[in-house]
């Protein structure tokens, strides 16, 4: 929505695209919670914890379907953008599940994972706003790049929150990624550190 200020903010398509992005985001959270076996989401019981994995997965699928239905009215370019974003979301999840391959640097691999899983969705959200409001091509491309970088930064900050915050502050169970062995910026940097106090976190 903020990106639409670079064009005509009054375009109804901008609002519809924002709904598409939020539905897509929510769908990925349902699926992520199943894969992570997360008991909480934003401080409340997760869907998979309350209703089971099957219902949580199907709910995520339903949200993807509703997003696709809305997209049909936004034109082929919007549909293509969403399809490519969905592709990156899935690729990011696959890369995270498989881990670094063939001696790849774990930190570089992790950055590529969050670029696909989080950066792509941020970038697409901003691109929709700029594109559908009629902003110039130069502005659309610049904002898309900016959105991806903001998405990566957001995820890196979230990694720190997972370690450093209390449940009443973040709505999350602290140390979830650490306990489950999920590589994050924090754990990857600690593994490279030499200080004894850092090694205690591993």
Feature roles, as predicted:
Residues 1-199:
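Mg2+-dependent prenyl diphosphate-binding active-site environment of isoprenoid biosynthetic enzymes
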């Amino acid at each position: 929505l903020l990106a639409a200020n670079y064009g005509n903010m009054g375009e109804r398509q901008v609002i519809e695209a924002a709904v598409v992005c939020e539905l897509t985001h929510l769908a990925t959270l349902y699926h992520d919670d199943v894969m992570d076996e997360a008991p909480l989401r934003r401080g409340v019981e997760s869907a998979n914890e309350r209703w089971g994995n099957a219902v949580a997965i199907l709910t995520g699928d339903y949200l993807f379907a509703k997003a696709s239905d809305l997209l049909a009215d936004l034109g082929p370019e919007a549909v293509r953008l969403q399809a490519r974003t969905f592709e990156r979301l899935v690729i990011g999840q696959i890369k995270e599940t498989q881990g670094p391959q063939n001696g790849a640097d774990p930190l570089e691999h992790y950055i590529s994972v969050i670029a696909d899983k989080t950066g792509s969705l941020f970038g697409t959200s901003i691109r929709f706003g700029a594109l559908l409001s009629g902003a110039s091509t130069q502005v659309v491309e610049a904002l898309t790049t900016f959105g991806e970088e903001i998405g990566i930064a957001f995820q890196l900050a979230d990694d720190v929150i997972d370690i450093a915050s209390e449940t009443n502050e973040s709505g999350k169970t602290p140390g979830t990624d650490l306990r489950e062995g999920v590589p994050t910026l924090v754990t990857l940097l600690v593994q490279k550190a030499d200080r004894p106090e850092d090694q205690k976190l591993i």
